[in-house]
Amino acid sequence: QRISFMRDKTRDDRFFILTLFAIAMELRKMGQLQPMLSVELAVGLPPEHYGTLRDKFANYFKRGSIQFVFNDTPICLMVQQVFVYPQAYAAVVPQAEKLRETPRTFVVDIGGYTTDVLLLRTTRPDMQFCRSLELGVIDMNNAIIGKVSALHDIQIEDDHIADIIMGRPSILPQEVQDTIFSETRSYSSQILDKLRELKVDLRATPAIFIGGGAALFRNFIESSPMVAHADFIPDQRANAIGYGMLANAQLSRMQTYNGGGDGIVRG
C-alpha cells in the first residue's frame, strides 16, 4: 500500500522501517549483506524543509543497535553516522562542472506528491529560495483515473497512464488515450503556471528537471512557451547517487581532519 504524503517523516516508524529494508536490499545486491552491519547513512529532505527538519530527520535514524529480519535472515544494524542533504541539489551534483558555467539554474524535482524547486547560483544551492507545490504525479494520476472512469467507464491504473504518455504500445481506445494526453498536458501547464506565481520564471532562467515526473512530462515541458531551456535527469536514483557522492566527500574531509563528532552530519 502506498504511503500518503507526510511533510514530517519522523512522525512514525514507517519510513524508518522502509529504510532498514532498503539498506538490506542494497547490501544484498552488492554482495555485502551480513548478520552484523555497521553503516553510514545518507538521506535527503525537500529543500524547503531542509533547514527546519534536518536535525530531527538525522536523529530519527540514530537508534543504536537495531535488530530486524530480512528474508528470514536476522540482522543487527548499527547506523554510525547520518548525512542529510537537500533533495534536488543532490541530483545535480554529478553535473557540477557544467553548472559552473551558468550563474543561475532552477532544479525542479517532480515527485509523486510534490514539486520542489531549488535555485542554484553556479554550483551552490540558495537555501533562501526554495519553493514547494503539492502537485505531483500521483495527484495527476488519481485525477486522470477518475476522469477516464467518469467519461469512458473504463478502469485504468498508473501503468496505463505511463504507457500512453511514454508512447508505449497500448490497447486502450483512442478516446481514452486522448483524455490521458489532454489531462497530462493540462497538469504540466498547471505546474508551470503555479511555479511562475512563486517567482520561478523558466522563461528567464534555465532549468533542470529531475524525478519520476521529469520523464513523464518531458515532451509537454519542452514544447511549453513557459520554458526557455530545460535539461532532464530522468534517473529516479539521481538524488540517491548524489547523496552517496556528497557523503563520500564529507567522510573523506572528516578523516582528513580526524572529525567524528556526534555521528550526525548535516549537508
Which sequence ranges carry the predicted segments?
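Short, basic interhelical loop/turn and adjoining N-cap
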Residues: 152-154
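Active-site-proximal alpha-helical scaffolds that flank and shape metal-associated catalytic sites
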Residues: 108-112
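Short acidic-glycine loop/turn motifs at beta-strand connectors
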Residues: 121-123
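Short beta-strand scaffold segments in enzyme catalytic cores
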Residues: 115-119
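Nucleotide/phosphate-binding catalytic cleft detector across ATP-hydrolyzing
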Residues: 1-105, 125-138, 159-267
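Long, charge-rich alpha-helical interaction segments
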Residues: 142, 146-149
